[in-house]
Amino acid sequence: MSNSHPYASFQDVSLEYPNGTIGLSKANLSINEGEFIALVGPSGSGKTTLLNTLAGFVHPTTGSVSINGQVVADESIFVPPEHRHLGMVFQQHALWPHMSVGRNVEYPLKQTKTPQDERRRRVNWALKLVGLEGFADRNPSELSGGQSQRVAIARAIVAQPSMLLLDEALSALDEPLRESLRLELRHMTIDLGLTTLHVTHDRGEAIALADRIVMLDHGHIRQIGTPDDLLNRPADPIVASFFDDATLFEGQCDNGIFRTHKPSFHIPTRLLQTEDGMPEGPGTLVVLPDAMTLVEDSIWRENTAVSPDMDTSSL
């Protein structure tokens, strides 16, 4: 469970690539200490760009990025990745094939000139934490895909970072293994108090793991909220369609009645769930799958408040 202290933040962060493509557009996000945040969205939405901006792999065009109260990137400041004290795991675990498991895991510690005895202790601790105790002398070629990803996770946490970045870290694994690692990963981040930013294309994974979810589309943050918020109170049709395969009806709201264009029906706005009431004018009706039931036409006409024509006298 997270507390209210922001550990990382993005303030009006925009990123434009040299070819003119917009990676991010005025992104604002505060990540609380100990919080597990999932970044979701379609391909090209900006979720990996947001993570890479925090990691220090790209420099934002405008805006600022802060970690633990320190600005690490703005128009004049740029702290390189190796000085941001972040652990990172990617879709491809990228273990060095010529190094043993133990040497792979200890690599970040050698870069910081950690004493050998302390390196050995931390490597054993990290491997035990991911369920690979006794694997230090094995070669990567002897490992399964799941074991290799566990080694990558051990390497990411061995230097005891205060924040963990995951970029599709589980997506290359088979579903039964992914499910198992999801649970272990969540328990581990809670036990270690790690603030976590997790990029995933899997809606179910985001819902299962995250304290809050950030939905992006074309570089814009569409909504930030709990899994329940995005499932049951989507901010717009894009969020609704991504999370729940919602059916969308374009229409017009007039005098307390929402009338759709095609197919044509109308419904009193008092029956609709809205954040701040239903404003007059054009809009989109979002119907979630579990809100629909198929019934016989005669039963529907007798019991529904939704009418298939424009006659409102029965409403």
Where do the protein language model's features map onto the residues?
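Conserved ABC transporter NBD signature motif
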Residues: 63-74
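The feature captures the beta-strand-to-loop junction immediately N-terminal to the Walker
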Residues: 40-42
